[in-house]
Amino acid sequence: MKSTLMTASLLILVLLSIVDYASVYAELIDSEISMERQWINACFNICMKISSDQKYCKSFCG
């Protein structure tokens, strides 16, 4: 009984650490995507001020 309880507790701790790691990793990916969007928007805005060619700026900035 005691070993079953310890095994269950250990399993719960492992599962909680996996869920915690997954949520931190998801936040990291989300922040990277957000930073990439900010970079693309800034690039596009600067390009439009310089060239005013929307097609060129879209292809240049991604």
UniProtKB/Swiss-Prot annotation:
Tell me which UniProt keywords the record has, alphabetically.
Disulfide bond, Ion channel impairing toxin, Neurotoxin, Potassium channel impairing toxin, Secreted, Signal, Toxin, Voltage-gated potassium channel impairing toxin
Where, subcellularly, is it found?
Secreted
Q: In which tissues is it expressed?
A: Expressed by the venom gland.
Propeptide segment residues: 27-36
**A Gene Ontology molecular function term of the record:** toxin activity
Q: Does the keyword Signal apply?
A: yes
From which domain of life does this come?
Eukaryota
Q: Which GO terms describe its cellular component?
A: extracellular region
- Which pairs of positions does the record mark as disulfide bonds? C43-C61, C47-C57
* Signal peptide start-end: 1-26
Residues in a coiled coil are: none
Transmembrane regions: none
Family indicated by similarity: Belongs to the short scorpion toxin superfamily. Potassium channel inhibitor kappa-KTx family. Kappa-KTx 3 subfamily.
Q: What role does this protein play?
A: Potassium channel inhibitor (Kv).
Domain topic, free-text comment: Has the structural arrangement of two alpha-helices stabilized by disulfide bonds (CSalpha/alpha 2(S-S)).
**Name by which UniProt lists this protein:** Potassium channel toxin kappa-KTx 3.3
From which organism does this entry originate? Heterometrus petersii
